[in-house]
């Protein structure tokens, strides 16, 4: 029951700490959700006879209410989706001319043909220098509580605007430069007008973020797991169902649940014992709250078999190693090789299929004599 005690202590800490009201509410809601998940887990486990081996019990059905199938899109209250906006966002996702040296686009680090990331511990910026964190996948990211490992952007729309201006990433000198590049091409001007009808001057940096965000809100990868959640009980094999039971019994569902199988909360890395060689402060660098030191957004496990290396620093190379370490450092459990293999078998069922037509690189407008370079 130590996890419940931890949740209650964390709740008391948040309640007595001076924090912005909206942020405090957000944290308390996360803690409440975590406690509800734990209560669900303990109720299920305590309901079984003490003489019944958990390995003999089909836990699959019992834990399914903690999950949701993927939607067809992730709506936003302040960014209405329309085809013109989505198509523009796709072009902007692949646009390099807004970067310094015209070398980089969103797709440089978040490659759509490799599940929205680049399989590198750290991604190189426009000068070839490596960043300080691994590039997370853009697939299914719109489902998440926030963006970036530390949650510093509240939405995919806001996230899209960050790397473009980051001197270590795409390196654009200013928002004005990006707007100037886009306005220099009549095809982009027409596309912005179609995407944002009624606006007198739609080519803005904020609308750049909204267009990319609209595109990303349909970057979803349904898998056999979704078919299973929708009622097709034959969608998963018996081994995959067994793997999910092991996943649930181990306690992984405490943080990895919902439509994203993660991505809905923050958690401390090294919850029950210090994570080895952890230098990144994580969430506390954003909130300036020492109580959130070493907290990171819980990653989604969708397509996890395709997105190695793992963690914010790409320090874990294989999925098997990642499963073992999560159990040990987050749940105080030592898994057998058989249990690790079983969980990995389930995780493989979370690999989805990107829409090849939707993610295909589009034709971009031609530069003009007025198109600036940085």
PLM features per residue range, with description:
Residues 5-8, 14-18, 33:
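Acidic, Ala/Val/Gly-enriched low-complexity intrinsically disordered segments
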